[in-house]
Amino acid sequence: MEIRVANKYALGKKLGSGSFGDIYVAKDIVTMEEFAVKLESTRSKHPQLLYESKLYKILGGGIGVPKVYWYGIEGDFTIMVLDLLGPSLEDLFTLCNRKFSLKTVRMTADQMLNRIEYVHSKNFIHRDIKPDNFLIGRGKKVTLIHIIDFGLAKKYRDSRSHTSYPYKEGKNLTGTARYASINTHLGIEQSRRDDIEALGYVLMYFLRGSLPWQGLKAISKKDKYDKIMEKKISTSVEVLCRNASFEFVTYLNYCRSLRFEDRPDYTYLRRLLKDLFIREGFTYDFLFDWTCVYASEKDKKKMLENKNRFDQTADQEGRDQRNN
């Protein structure tokens, strides 16, 4: 028996599960276009789909932000229909034998930083920056990296005055411990600096293949978090970035130097990574390590055909966000 959502979308195979519900693929019964559908039980103790749908509405229209087509309650489920995307960077990392080249890390970093800056420009911080929450697109958008999962996102400043909400301590860790900033481990209220620092750990994860605080033995969740924090604090940036270009040391030291209310200099960080790109003689051709493995010949052709369009979009995106 076919299950329909909003009498418009036919529910298909299950794509995955999270702590907050399940994700399915669905087809528009008229156009046959595919979408992603998130289902959350109306009996959930910690519902978040309503909150997340509101976030997507606020972020709507941003480059690399999925579009929501329908939200509502049917039967025992709260449902959200949104763009169907490709695999996550974590999936692609595994596909590439858990190591990305410097070129791929640099091209990936550029887009991820742009997505984070856009979220910040809308007065929110993500609070769960990790490879699983960045997905490539499909078809013509196969080279475009999208940011997803805003269930843990939080407003960090007043929308009108842009005054930061107050500094607090004694907070529980929100997000993924592997990539969490040191201040997050210390229980300090998160701000923009923490998303940027988390991205730095993601980039080193991609370059190294793993992080020094992975695989630690612990008897409880709290014990594990404590051990990750201790290892993270005791591992100097220079040791963490050993065998990586000095720009990554500069990046992380900059992140750790930011004060709670500081606006990160996204342009400086982009330029830092751009200088590395130029010095290494790379070409920004949108050919990632996973391109030959994942993309079809048709998709690869589209990537090359659309290179100039994406270059122009990225330039415009940077200008737009600097005006916020």
Swiss-Prot record:
Domain of life: Eukaryota
GO molecular function: ATP binding; metal ion binding; protein serine kinase activity; protein serine/threonine kinase activity
Catalytic machinery residues: D128 (proton acceptor)
Pfam (any one): Pkinase
InterPro entries: CK1_Ser-Thr_kinase, Kinase-like_dom_sf, Prot_kinase_dom, Protein_kinase_ATP_BS, Ser/Thr_kinase_AS
Cofactor: Mg(2+)
EC number(s) from the headed UniProt entry: 2.7.11.1
Enzyme class, UniProt record, top EC level: transferase
Effect noted on mutating G21A: Moderate decrease in catalytic activity. 110-fold decrease in affinity for ATP
Function: Serine/threonine-protein kinase likely to be involved in many cellular processes. Phosphorylates rhoptry protein RON3, nucleosome assembly protein NAPL and DNA/RNA-binding protein ALBA4 in vitro.
Similarity field: Belongs to the protein kinase superfamily. CK1 Ser/Thr protein kinase family. Casein kinase I subfamily.
Protein name (database record): Casein kinase I
Organism: Plasmodium falciparum (isolate Dd2)
Lineage: Eukaryota, Sar, Alveolata, Apicomplexa, Aconoidasida
